[in-house]
UniProtKB/Swiss-Prot annotation:
Its main location: membrane. PANTHER family: DNA GYRASE/TOPOISOMERASE SUBUNIT A, DNA TOPOISOMERASE 4 SUBUNIT A. Keywords: Cell membrane, DNA-binding, Isomerase, Membrane, Topoisomerase. One of its GO terms (biological process) is DNA topological change. This is DNA topoisomerase 4 subunit A.
Amino acid sequence: MDQKNNNLFQKAIEEVFAVSFSKYAKYIIQDRALPDLRDGLKPVQRRILYGMFQMGLKPTTPYKKSARAVGEIMGKYHPHGDSSIYDAIIRMSQSWKNNWTTVSIHGNNGSVDGDNAAAMRYTETRLSLYGFELLKDIDKKLVSFINNFDDSEKEPTVLPTLLPNLFINGASGIAAGYATNIAPHNTNELLDSLCLRIDQPNCELKQILKIVKGPDFPTGGNVYFEKSLSDIYQAGKGKFIIQAKYEVNKNLNQIEITQIPYETLKANIVKQIEEIIFDNKLSAIESVIDSSDRNGIRIIIKHKDFLPAEKIMAFLFKHTQLQVNFNLNNTVIANRFPIQIGLLSYLDHFLKFCHELIINKAKYELELASKRLEIILGLIKAISIIDKIIKLIRSAVDKSDAREKLIDNFKFTFNQAEAIVSLRLYQLTNTDIFELNQEQNELEKTVISSEQLIASEKARNKLLKKQFEGYKKQFHQQRRSQICGFINQKKVEESELIENKTYGVLITKAGNYHKFESNQLLKSTTDFKSESDTIIFAQTIANTDQIFIVTSLGNIINIPVYKLAFNSKNKLASLVSKKPILLEYETIVFVGTMNSVNQPILVLTSKLGMVKRIDLTKLNIKPLKATLCISLRDKDHLVSAFLQQDDKLICLVSDHNYYTVFHTNEIPLISSKGMGVKGMKLKLEDQIKFVVAFEANEPLVMICSDGSVINLKQTELVVVSRMATAKKLPVKKAINYCFSDATNTQLINFQGKNGSKLITTSELNQMSKTAISQTRFNKLN
């Protein structure tokens, strides 16, 4: 219960909140966010147009500073901040947002790229011809006026327009519990549909839709729909799909985009295509160039000829704003309440409003004409007895006495007598009776036509059709958007987007890569220079193939070759990039190709001597997603991985030159989450440095830190069981590299300060110790 004390009210917060919010919600629904069905304007837009009209900013008058208009509108009609008013003015002036702009701006009013308009102190504004037409005859009492926010001015509740502006320019807005999104339509089609509705008040929607083809957006584009047009326009709700319009130049392998979807930013579309090129999501696209100018939009996409332009565009429609959805929702204010309105209902409501305007105008003109006709008839009568009138006026004591005598003696009405005595005698005697008779005839015609318009719906319909035909000529509009019917989205398989070509791919331990022409494999490998990184994979491979990498953190990652960006220059890209495949501290241990599925067993070895085998076919490996293939303890990481064909010997070599050799089949097959088993007993502070898989007849080649090369035959090595006591190698120096080679022809990468060189084992044996000691080596797969 309310308690009143010293003009204070105590109420429960939930009661205050409910009442206050409901009032606020009603206000923003009725007076802020939703357009009026009749003139298609929100309150701020209506106040802007009326404020400019009151300032005399007509299409034929000079521009005035936007800041001045904003101040006038804010001070008299819309006290909600200058930025909201100026933003609305700018939007009302943008030809890519409206079929017909209601405001004209002199200066920078933004761009289709989303650039901001110049500040209001720099731009100038006035009403456009279309905007002025919305206000036509507003001073003839066609619409009602209400007090402004401080009761110091009057403002119209609606503009007296005979143009169906709601559907011509569309509208969008969000209120409490309501939202609206009305599509722009073609002016000529709407006016023709109104004429049809006048001629055939009971016509069906399908007849209207033969005229109104669908939305017509200022930026054009191809328009599709999922439900039928009749369902969408019957309910006033539905979804349109807008696609960019493009042309194909097959000779130049170019796609030229000439129209973009409504409410999208050209710069964002270009950026999205550039990101697709940068991320190598579609290798068929070579470049995108924005060549747009004042003559229109022109985005040029250069592409390779292996993929048709239609499939490229199908991909871009899916992954960029070259295709967007427009969710139609015709929510408007009608009779102070929000309703969702279909096309037929809108035409009927609007025609009813037009009839009200015509009747109000006819009443206004009838009143003026009747009053003037009364005066003219009195003047004509006075001229016919001018001598008596003059004599009577001269005998009168004053003006009121003369007026009374005219009424009493000659039966003039009060208004007629007032008009006569208000004239000077020379005006009365010199008045041309012919001109008065002519004006009488015109006024009588006006009275008759006004009375006819008030009384006859048929007469009003005739006038409306004439007005609509005039608007069709004055605001003639060619259709910009093409209505293409039901959407039939072309499905493009990923395999179709991949260029069937062989490339060279080079991958380093640190996660850098280079994709190049296949004939440049040797050059790219030998040109590689790095003091801290090492090549571990250099191979020609089909673009349609896939590689997988095993990392030091125990992850296995599948990478489609086409996802690797091509670079004609000898420049490395990184897998630790904007969208990282590897973590910054993660390195690559092994690289294989997915065509090795016939060798699905992967053998893994960690720094702390843990070994395991894993079946690749049982892993759910997804492209570009890390899949765990071994669990690692703290401070442990993978040092080796290789694919097992048959049972081989595996040699684990430690930092302290201990080794153990056993058969790979002794290593158990373990699930991806398993840590594996001990492969070698390590002494304190020792760790695995090299892992070599080899056949029984293959020698081990060891490169020592002093540059010496040692070949150990299998007979010199002790083959034991896994976890047997490690043996000491007959080598005193630290081992820099270790590999197997039975033929002395194994290619290894000789990497020095001045670049890289591919050499065989036999060539290695002929090098000096000094040269060998200053280089790094690695076997290439």
